[in-house]
């Protein structure tokens, strides 16, 4: 816990200093705020260091064992008989082992550099309060999950970095990236649907529909939970079957309430945010 608190406070104050010493710049004709790159880079380095050199957090041991089994050459990866799913992820691991290092700890470090780096760069480019973005990233549990779900968060970080493409409607670039990310983790395929949904007006019919479906699934979880578990049982995620059935009503209620706070605040400030934040619709619907 000591490392955790040091990470939280050091990154918060480094990002606070970065914002306080930042300034407005013109990027492609648009006036945008940029925090001080030196302090922001130091905060990013702290997050990467803690993640990349972690020991015993979540599935870290499992991933390190897995990295050891992946061939240390790209040719060996192509001919490996047991790699059938999430092949893009294992291809990246094989590339790292061949070109950088075969040490599993260094593979973890490379994954942290890419995942945390992409997330942090996206925060840096799209928020005026980077210290709050990083604070919420850590305290909401997202930072911890990057260490537990390495495949999921690697794919998520790439798609998060590319989300401005949704706003610009650059589907010719975005959709192929989604398909590539699905080779890292198949859950990325949901973004094929989300591309056509999340740029709808906030608090319109789309928002109401998503909230209705979410509440419906929560209320009917005793019925829908086992159905979902049965569907997952025939896939690579079948190991989550028992968790879905035995976990009561799914996610921890405290986490649900915490994650609902930004939604409530965005509703209360919807009239102000609509005209000021260009990514308001996308961020709200993705969060919901």
Question: Where on the chain are the PLM-derived regions?
Answer:
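Transmembrane-embedded, aromatic-rich helix segments that form part
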Residues: 7, 174-176, 187-198
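Loop-to-helix entry region of an early transmembrane alpha helix in multi-pass inner-membrane enzymes
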Residues: 87, 99-114
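Membrane-interface transmembrane helices that cradle and orient dolichyl/undecaprenyl
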Residues: 159-172
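Transmembrane-helix signature of polytopic, membrane-embedded enzymes
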Residues: 120-140
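Alpha-helical transmembrane segments and terminal signal-anchor/GPI-anchor hydrophobic tails
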Residues: 61-64, 90, 195-288
């Amino acid at each position: 816990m000591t490392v955790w608190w040091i990470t939280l406070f050091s990154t918060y104050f480094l990002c606070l200093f970065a914002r306080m010493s930042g300034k407005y710049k013109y990027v492609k004709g648009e006036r945008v705020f940029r925090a001080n790159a030196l302090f922001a880079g130091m905060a990013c380095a702290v997050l990467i260091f803690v993640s990349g050199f972690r020991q015993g957090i979540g599935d870290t041991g499992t991933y390190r064992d897995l990295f050891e089994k992946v061939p240390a050459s790209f040719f060996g990866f192509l001919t490996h008989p047991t790699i059938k799913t999430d092949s893009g992820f294992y291809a990246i691991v094989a590339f790292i082992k061949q070109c950088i290092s075969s040490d599993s700890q260094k593979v973890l470090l490379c994954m942290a550099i890419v995942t945390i780096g992409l997330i942090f760069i996206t925060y840096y480019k799209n928020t005026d309060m980077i210290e709050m973005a990083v604070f919420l990233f850590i305290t909401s549990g997202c930072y911890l999950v990057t260490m537990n779900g390495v495949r999921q968060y690697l794919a998520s970080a790439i798609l998060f970095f590319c989300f401005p493409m949704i706003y610009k409607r650059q589907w010719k670039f975005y959709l192929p990236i989604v398909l590539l990310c699905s080779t890292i983790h198949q859950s990325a395929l949901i973004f094929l649907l989300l591309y056509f949904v999340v740029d709808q007006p906030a608090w319109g019919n789309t928002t109401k529909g998503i909230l209705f479906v979410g509440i419906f699934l929560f209320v009917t979880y005793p019925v829908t939970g086992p159905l979902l578990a049965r569907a997952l049982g025939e896939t690579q995620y079948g190991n989550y079957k028992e968790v879905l059935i035995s976990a009561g009503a799914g996610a921890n209620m405290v986490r649900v309430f915490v994650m609902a706070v930004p939604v409530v605040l965005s509703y209360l400030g919807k009239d102000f945010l609509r005209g000021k934040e260009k990514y308001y619709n996308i961020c709200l619907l993705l969060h919901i």
